[in-house]
Amino acid sequence: MIEVLLVTICLAAFPYQGSSIILESGNVNDYEVIYPRKVTALPKGAVQPKYEDAMQYELKVNGEPVVLHLEKNKGLFSKDYSETHYSPDGRKITTNPPVEDHCYYHGRIENDADSTASISACNGLKGHFKLQGETYLIEPLKLSDSEAHAVFKFENVEKEDEAPKMCGVTQNWESYEPIKKASQSNLTPEHQRYIELFLVVDHGMFMKYNGNSDKIRRRIHQMVNIMKEAYRYLYIDIALTGVEIWSNKDMINVQPAAPQTLDSFGEWRKTDLLNRKSHDNAQLLTSTDFKDQTIGLAYWGSMCDPKRSTAVIEDHSETDLLVAVTMAHELGHNLGIRHDTGSCSCGGYSCIMAPVISHDIAKYFSDCSYIQCWDFIMKDNPQCILNKQLRTDTVSTPVSGKNFGAGEECDCGTPGNPCCDAVTCKLRPGAQCAEGLCCDQCRFMKEGTVCRRARGDDMDDYCNGISAGCPRNPFHA
């Protein structure tokens, strides 16, 4: 039986309203100071890990109580995750740091079917969540009261530069074909693809963060956490397989002309990086201010190509979410997705593949993106993304795909997993499920709960009350 342990983080239950403050996410004009309360569900006698597989926080937003449900982002790192930096004399130093008990989560707000959350719990709560259609950011305050957090609407972050920022991909870069309805749009989990992503940080970005590699790593991990959330609606799973920081000097000529930088980075990946580290796609993060308001550039329809499965990204904002959306956008081009047009829809929200970054944060791919991505995958069949990467958060080696091994009922996780026993790979007493869009606190969500919002003129998908998966609506167009 699962016991619920209430841990009161702070006795203060009321928010404090502030007018202006400088935070890691930027200058914020209007914010609340809040004190989250943590509610932890752990099985009786279980050893509590540093970061639990599932957590709940009670907090106040606009003075109203909300409950934030969080689940650890399993598979965020590949089994062979590595980090590389360079010594002052130019020697390459590569390590395989332990990342099993990481602190990155996805989640939702209780009683808000359209809510999402992407949170780092490494040092307090830092990230974003969507509540009643509005995007909020949360981060710890550096005060003597260490449990205080600031929560604020994304729209209250001062814009660092009012000039429009855009993707450098144009029709000259794309292989244009008219958008059409794909016959394979009715996808199932068996179609899932897996991308092992490698990220490179240039020397300028290393210096921008004062040589603080830990801060850079935390930023990168949270941005990939956000990317992974966005791509799950395309049935694509992303795992970070490596980070390389050019701590001594740049390994290529990083210049304001994005096309030249992308070409150089692609050559370096093909002749150097791929010879020492297997991965599917690589992105270069740079502090360089690209010309013509460009903040990212990628080759179109190039996934798995040794040189062209690459992108370059300008670290253009202090807000993790904005840079993560740019990374997701450029990866989309590698997957054959073009810029959205007026006929594309994200259910009333801004779309990730818009050619110009919007002041309304984009969190979703459009109906057009969904069709184009799977048109590319089915026609070009990029082989490198067929294999499921080994995860770091398992006790025993996980089986490939969605099927479990003989006698297994769930994917083995950490010992603190409240739903799945990490030793036996069986559901714990009282648990119906361990993961899935229709699994909440180890139980199937009730029939009729929206598990996947519609894109464009399509229809919502609903839980059926008897399984953890999110079945496709049979009335989809």
From Swiss-Prot:
Assembly notes: Monomer.
Keyword Protease: yes
MF terms in GO: metal ion binding; metalloendopeptidase activity; toxin activity
A Pfam cross-reference name: Pep_M12B_propep
Cofactor: Zn(2+)
TM helices/strands, residue ranges: none
Activity-regulation annotation: Inhibited by 1,10-phenanthroline and EDTA.
Propeptide: 21-187, 390-404
A GO CC annotation given for this chain: plasma membrane
Residues annotated as catalytic: E330
Domain Disintegrin: residue ranges: 396-477
Anything else known: The disintegrin belongs to the medium disintegrin subfamily.
Cofactor info, note text: Binds 1 zinc ion per subunit.
Sites where the protein binds Zn(2+): H329, H333, H339
Organism: Bothrops jararaca (Jararaca)
Positions of disulphide bridges: C304-C384, C344-C368, C346-C351, C410-C425, C412-C420, C419-C442, C433-C439, C438-C463, C451-C470
Cellular localization per UniProt: Secreted
UniProt name for this protein: Zinc metalloproteinase/disintegrin
Domain of life: Eukaryota
Primary residence: secreted
Tissue expression summary: Expressed by the venom gland.
Positions annotated to bind Ca(2+): E196, D280, C384, N387
Residues spanned by motif Cell attachment site: 455-457
Ranges where the Peptidase M12B domain occurs: 193-389
Family the entry assigns: Belongs to the venom metalloproteinase (M12B) family. P-II subfamily. P-IIa sub-subfamily.
Extent of the signal sequence: 1-20
EC supergroup of this enzyme: hydrolase
